[in-house]
């Protein structure tokens, strides 16, 4: 199977935006792309329905076929760590179900983009005083990681800590995507520092869009993705998709 697990250095680094752009760009190149977000917290209500808004955005933007509730089997309204949100709602995050859903999806698509819920060290569930962490799920379904980061103050520390955590727990971190790039004077210095310390390829720099997510202008997004996920970037990214 061919898939990549997208995680972030922190909350609000734009994983969903990157996943949407990556799925769209690969579809534009003619690839059959699937999307999977096993767990989502902070879901929004639309009437009586709880909507996995990240999944809905990616599926609609990239024109991916699939039921959003199948693509995101565990959805919680509370904007909290999954193990807390699940406990509050008395729901068990069934890891076997996640694995089975991923296996089923992988039969239908050439490549699958998996979006994590936060970073590597996020607890997904707690059972008998034992935590099951996101990095454990990654190792069990697709040890093939792309890290999304930014260039904001503090990102060098966050990125290096994430990379060292990945190494310590045997994760295969194959590339870094820098989001919210503004082409300001010190940004490339930050990116070069990260590249030198980690020796991990910088797969792409994705331009900052000021209006996201309040203004969903598809043409604006597509212009950014055409530029940032050009043929050279796509070739580097395609080398990651191998579980």
UniProtKB/Swiss-Prot annotation:
Listed cofactors: Mg(2+)
Active site: 37
Subcellular location as annotated: Cytoplasm
GO molecular function: ATP binding; dethiobiotin synthase activity; magnesium ion binding
InterPro entries the record matches: DTB_synth_BioD (IPR004472), P-loop_NTPase (IPR027417)
Positions bound to ATP: 12-17, 54, 115-118, 179-180
The protein's Enzyme Commission number: 6.3.3.3
Alphabetized UniProt keyword annotations: ATP-binding, Biotin biosynthesis, Cytoplasm, Ligase, Magnesium, Metal-binding, Nucleotide-binding
Gene3D superfamilies: P-loop containing nucleotide triphosphate hydrolases
Pathway: Cofactor biosynthesis; biotin biosynthesis; biotin from 7,8-diaminononanoate: step 1/2
GO biological process: biotin biosynthetic process
SUPFAM superfamilies registered for this protein in UniProt: P-loop containing nucleoside triphosphate hydrolases
Binding site for substrate: 41
Annotated GO CC locations: cytosol
Record's function text: Catalyzes a mechanistically unusual reaction, the ATP-dependent insertion of CO2 between the N7 and N8 nitrogen atoms of 7,8-diaminopelargonic acid (DAPA, also called 7,8-diammoniononanoate) to form a ureido ring.
Subunit structure: Homodimer.
Identification of the protein by name: ATP-dependent dethiobiotin synthetase BioD
Organism of origin: Caldicellulosiruptor bescii (strain ATCC BAA-1888 / DSM 6725 / KCTC 15123 / Z-1320) (Anaerocellum thermophilum)
Gene name per UniProt: bioD
């Amino acid at each position: 199977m061919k898939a990549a697990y997208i995680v972030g250095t922190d909350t609000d680094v734009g994983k969903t935006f990157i996943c949407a752009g990556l799925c769209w760009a690969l579809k534009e190149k003619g690839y059959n792309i699937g999307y999977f977000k096993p767990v989502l917290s902070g879901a929004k209500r639309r009437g009586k329905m709880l909507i996995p808004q990240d999944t809905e955005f990616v599926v609609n933007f990239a024109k991916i076929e699939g039921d959003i509730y199948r693509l995101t089997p565990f959805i919680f309204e509370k904007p909290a760590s999954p193990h807390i949100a699940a406990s509050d709602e008395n729901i068990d995050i069934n890891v076997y179900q996640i694995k089975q859903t991923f296996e089923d999806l992988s039969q239908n698509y050439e490549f699958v983009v998996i979006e994590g819920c936060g970073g590597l060290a996020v607890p997904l569930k707690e059972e008998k005083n034992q935590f099951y962490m996101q990095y454990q799920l990654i190792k069990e379904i697709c040890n093939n990681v792309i890290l999304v980061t930014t260039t904001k103050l503090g990102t060098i520390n966050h990125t290096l800590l994430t990379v060292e955590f990945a190494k310590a727990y045997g994760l295969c971190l194959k590339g870094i995507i820098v989001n919210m790039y503004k082409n300001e004077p010190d940004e490339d210095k930050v990116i070069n520092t990260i590249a030198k310390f980690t020796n991990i390829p910088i797969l792409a720099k994705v331009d900052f869009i000021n209006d996201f997510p309040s203004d969903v202008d598809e043409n604006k997004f597509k212009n950014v993705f055409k530029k940032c996920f050009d043929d050279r970037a796509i070739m580097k990214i395609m080398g990651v998709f191998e579980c």
